[in-house]
């Protein structure tokens, strides 16, 4: 079952709101991009010291009907395709004998191509407005305050937001 959301109506609800996103991983950055495209005031808070702090990590595959759909809506699908690598699959038994193979063919090359985690982060960061991401800000408490939220960070600083989206992990 697919649920359709009237995005124009939803974005109008956020037009005068300050939205905080906790986490500058793929989900947090994609959400920031989608909301910024619709004129929402976004700040992303990330515990990493800077965008190069996590140079390790493997690859991610974005499936056609989920991650690729989000990249499409964010206007970043072609950039993703430019850096992603189509992947074939071999299924083997316990002795290493190939039981079945799925080779990459032109018609399935974009089914779920792999992209380096850091390349994906760079694509998403470059799509955001300057100063959207505040680095080295680890959230330690989140408290309601009337119609707003108070975010307190490990460095004892605090910020206020109308809406908080937790996207860590």
Feature-to-residue mapping (PLM):
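Conserved N-terminal helical subregion
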Residues: 4-19, 24, 34-36, 61-169
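Glycine-rich FAD pyrophosphate-binding loop
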Residues: 36-56
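N-terminal Rossmann-fold NAD(P) dinucleotide-binding loop
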Residues: 28-29
């Amino acid at each position: 079952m697919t649920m359709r959301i009237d995005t124009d109506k939803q974005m109008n609800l956020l037009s005068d709101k300050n939205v905080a996103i906790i986490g500058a991983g793929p989900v947090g950055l994609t959400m920031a991009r989608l909301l910024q495209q619709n004129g929402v005031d976004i700040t992303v808070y990330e515990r990493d010291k800077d965008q190069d702090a996590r140079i390790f990590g493997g690859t991610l595959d974005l499936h056609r009907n989920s991650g690729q759909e989000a990249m499409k809506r964010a206007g970043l699908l072609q950039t993703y395709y430019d850096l992603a690598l189509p992947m074939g699959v071999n299924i083997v038994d316990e002795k290493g004998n190939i039981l079945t193979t799925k080779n990459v063919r032109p018609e399935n090359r974009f089914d779920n191509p792999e992209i380096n985690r850091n390349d994906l982060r760079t694509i998403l960061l470059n799509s955001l407005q300057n100063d959207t991401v505040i680095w080295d800000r680890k959230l330690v408490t989140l408290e309601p305050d009337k119609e707003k939220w108070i975010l307190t960070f490990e460095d004892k600083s605090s910020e206020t937001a109308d809406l908080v989206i937790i996207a860590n992990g």
